[in-house]
Curated annotation (Swiss-Prot), chain B:
This is Prolactin. InterPro entries: 4_helix_cytokine-like_core (IPR009079), Somatotropin/Prolactin (IPR001400), Somatotropin_CS (IPR018116). It comes from Dicentrarchus labrax (European seabass). Keywords: Disulfide bond, Hormone, Secreted, Signal. GO terms for molecular function: hormone activity.
Length: 624, 212
């Protein structure tokens, strides 16, 4: 019983003793060998991590065993490598041999063994960092670069080839946070390019054995790259100067060629250009010079003319005997540039001279000066337009616009005829062209009229005064007559040129008032005499021609007289102002003057008997 | 890849043969070439071992046969640096050649075994073993030619027969264990070969200190 109590008490004592202490001692916790390293493959060190110490002072011991023997050795050196470490020196280190290492922690209460670790020295090599890292700044063609050089760790025996190290360097700018890593292989020197001028660089180097672990990074080396900005700047300055120079040159060139450039970029709008027409003169208002210039260049002369003079009371149309003469005349006229001069003198004895008062009305001309002016101007541009022969100075006051067209004739293949026509056309077409003026009425035969002017018509402005419509010169006169003849005949010859031919040949032809335009211009068209309604081949101007102006009656009706027989007068006669009868153009009297009177024109068309064309004052002159 | 390796080895042999014939190529370059190959060899074996370890059951460690039981352990190789540096070049070369020779057959067995190895990374392991085989063969052939330059001592090769048997045990654990054991033996021996060749290279390249 007592024994039981004693045992019980002892037991209690044993149980409570630890609790009485409060801290609770225990055998040490299990230490762990966390790493072993060899810096040069000749020695190595192992470090362990102690476990809990159990509240009591604990001692550690490391025991190892080589694979070749069963002998257990204790760590020879606990202090060289620091606390909780074991250093194996060269004598104790064998390579290509497995070590079985165990750490034992011991305290008063007991000891604890760590887990054993097998290591082979050759597999745990981690060298020291490279030593004596130097960085210098060198220049490569004025561009700086870093040269980094170092030494292997002094312990590592690379000379004999026992350990082979490869290196790595890393560089960064002071203010940056990312490193730039370069692999340097086995060499002990490295160049770093692409530096920023004026920056401070940090350089570090580390190494690794061929089959081992990387060393720690060496201590940082600082290097400052000198400024080479000024060198860059000088280059920039050069570039700026050069470009400024080039810019100046370009500006100067541009300035020099500004005109041509302007022409290139904004070409001037071409305006209508009349040969010999001087815009400046026109602007200045000097019409005489202007028109004289035109006359010079084959234009109907438009010197100041007296419209009144231009007007003729009646148109005297003569049929020249010989065609050749006419032709010649025509040619002359054709060739020459006839100035428009209206001379009052009428040397023409009455062959349809411009000055003939019977042709044109004076009033017409006077009144229509303005209109003529405009007409004249128009004339140039409107080739096909009606030309009213309106010559101020000329006796014949024809509207400027009357004269233009006889395109058909111009297109006539027959030269003579064409020339004839030309002549006529000239005569007709020139407003400026003073029919009364001697010479050059006929300007440019083909001027503007070469083309097939549909209707050839010519308007006459009949005026009282009938200045000689035809130019004073005989030639001209004749030609004029011829012209008039031709014109007359050709007027209204809308037909094919073929048709024109024959009528052209015929000296005497009809003149038919084609129409009266609003300017009181009488458009005459030749009538093919003898052509019936249907089948008038214009080619046969039968013997009807009238180019004889009989007179102008009071109503400003130009009366034309037919010269010859009238047998074949065209039965179909009626006025068509735009008579588009196929082949037949009949003459019609034309009362000109105004539009209002245009109607009457038609009415009076039948004035003429026998197919005459009573070219009364067709046109125009209404308002005078 | 295999053809490339054989071509490479052939080329290497040709080069060495030419060297033997004409001695136009310096030894240091040849040794440099050889050490590069051995370096590759060892790296491969290290990778292979790590692949094996990734899935190797830790408990297998306990029953891992000790490395001293490698079939090449009878070969006396230097165990530290002083000893290694005292060995002559011819002897070093002879050691290297012996080791290479000793591993030709076991590697074949390993290669065969790797095809059916019960391991998750069996494919890559098999490929790597194949490479090992080729590298070893080419290196051995090259060094056979090179040894002519080093004198008669380099010609002697110790015979280290492998007696492990063709058929590594039947059960899975045993097979894996054996495979792992062989690989660890080979890893060490390849490191030896590499180290010796690099020492030789450094010795031969007296005029080129940067090689060391």
């Amino acid at each position: 019983m007592k024994k039981v109590v004693e045992v019980f008490l002892l037991f209690l004592l044993l149980v409570f003793t630890p609790h009485a202490k409060g801290t609770g001692n225990s055998p040490p916790g299990k230490p762990t060998l966390n790493r072993c390293r060899s810096p040069e493959k000749e020695t190595f060190t192992c470090w362990w991590e102690p476990g809990s110490d159990g509240g009591l002072p604990t001692t550690f011991a490391l025991y190892y065993r080589k694979e070749t023997s069963e002998t257990v050795y204790e760590c020879p050196d606990y202090h060289t490598a620091g606390k909780n470490s074991c250093f194996f020196n060269k004598n104790d280190t064998s390579i290509w041999v497995n070590y079985n290492i165990t750490v034992v922690a011991t305290n008063a209460l007991g000891s604890t063994f760590s887990d054993p670790v097998d290591i082979d020295v050759v597999y745990i090599v981690k060298p020291n960092p490279p030593e004596r890292v130097t960085v210098i700044v060198l220049e490569d063609k004025s561009w700086p670069f870093l040269r980094v050089s170092w030494e292997p760790p002094h312990k590592a025996d690379t000379r004999s080839g026992w350990i082979t190290l490869v290196y790595q360097i890393r560089v960064k700018l002071e203010q940056e946070k990312d490193w730039e890593t370069h692999h340097a292989g086995q060499q002990k020197m490295f160049n770093v390019f692409s530096l920023r001028s004026g920056g401070t660089y940090l350089v570090q180097v580390r190494c690794k054995p061929d089959h081992g672990f990387w060393s720690e990074w060496s201590s940082t080396s600082y290097v400052k790259v000198p400024d080479y900005f000024h060198r860059e700047k000088s280059v920039w300055i050069l570039i700026m100067v050069f470009s400024a120079f080039i810019f100046l040159i370009l500006t100067w060139l541009l300035h020099m060629n500004s005109h041509s450039l302007k022409h290139c970029i904004l070409p001037p709008v071409p305006g209508p250009k009349i040969k010999g027409f001087d815009n400046q003169l026109l602007k200045n208002g000097k019409s005489e010079e202007l028109f004289s210039a035109l006359v010079v260049s084959d234009f109907p002369p438009t010197t100041s003319y007296n419209y009144e003079d231009l007007l003729v009371e009646y148109l005297e149309v003569n049929v020249p005997e010989e065609q050749e003469l006419m032709l010649e005349e025509n040619k002359d006229l054709h060739d020459g540039c006839l100035k428009s001069e209206c001379s009052t003198s009428d040397s023409d004895s009455g062959r349809g001279s411009c000055d003939s008062h019977t042709l044109l009305m004076d009033k017409c001309g006077e009144a229509k000066e303005e209109e003529r002016q405009t007409d004249q101007e128009r004339m140039g541009t409107e080739a096909e337009d009606m030309v009213s022969p309106d010559m101020s100075s000329g006796r014949v006051k024809t509207w400027p616009s009357v004269f233009s067209p006889l395109p058909q004739y111009s297109s006539n293949t027959l030269d003579e005829q064409s020339s004839l026509e030309m002549a006529k056309q000239h005569y007709l077409s020139d407003s400026q062209f003073l029919p009364s003026s001697t010479s050059s009425y006929l300007t440019q035969p083909g001027h503007g009229t070469k083309e097939a002017l549909g209707p050839s018509y010519w308007e006459f402005c009949l005026s009282n005064k009938q200045p000689h419509l035809l130019h004073p010169q005989t030639q001209a006169r004749q030609q004029l007559q011829a012209h008039s003849d031709v014109d007359i005949s050709s007027i209204g010859r809308k037909q094919a040129p073929a048709g024109l031919q024959s009528p052209l040949l015929r000296p005497t032809e009809y003149v038919e008032v084609q129409r009266v335009n609003e300017e009181d211009m009488v458009h005459l068209q030749p009538v093919v005499s003898g052509c019936g309604q249907n089948n008038c081949s214009p080619q046969m101007p039968q013997g009807e021609d009238y180019s004889k102006v009989k007179g102008v009656d009071s109503d400003n009706v130009l009366l034309l007289q037919r010269n010859m027989m009238e047998e074949d007068r065209c039965p179909c006669e009626h006025q068509e102002t735009n008579g588009v009868k196929e082949n037949c153009y009949t003459s019609s009297t034309v009362t000109t003057t105004q539009k209002p009177t245009a109607m009457p024109v038609q009415d009076e068309m039948v004035l003429g008997m026998n197919g005459y064309v009573d070219t009364a004052t067709m046109c125009i002159l209404p308002t005078y | 890849m295999a053809q490339r390796k054989t071509n490479g080895s052939k080329l290497f042999m040709m080069v060495l043969y030419m060297v033997a014939a004409c001695s136009a190529i310096p030894i240091s370059d040849l040794l440099d070439r050889a050490s590069q190959r051995s370096d590759t060899l060892h790296s491969l074996s290290t990778t292979l071992t790590q692949d094996l370890d990734s899935h190797f059951p830790p408990m297998g460690r306990v029953i891992t046969p000790r490395p001293s039981m490698c079939h090449t352990s009878s070969l006396h190789t230097p165990i530290d640096k002083e000893q290694a540096l005292q060995v002559s070049e011819a002897d070093l070369l002879s050691l290297v050649r012996s080791l290479l020779q000793a591993w030709r057959d076991p590697l074949v067995i390993l290669s065969t075994s790797a095809n059916t190895l019960p391991h998750p990374a069996q494919n890559s392991i098999s490929t790597k073993v194949q490479e090992l085989l080729e590298h070893t063969k080419s290196l051995g052939d090259g060094l056979d030619i090179l040894s002519g330059k080093f004198g008669p001592a380099a010609q002697s090769i110790s015979s280290l027969p492998y007696r492990g048997g063709n058929d590594i045990s039947q059960d899975r654990i045993s097979r894996l264990t054996n495979f792992h054991f062989l690989m660890s033996c080979f890893r060490r021996d390849s490191h030896k070969i590499d180290s010796f060749l690099k020492v030789l290279r450094c010795r031969a390249a007296k005029l080129q200190p940067e090689m060391c």
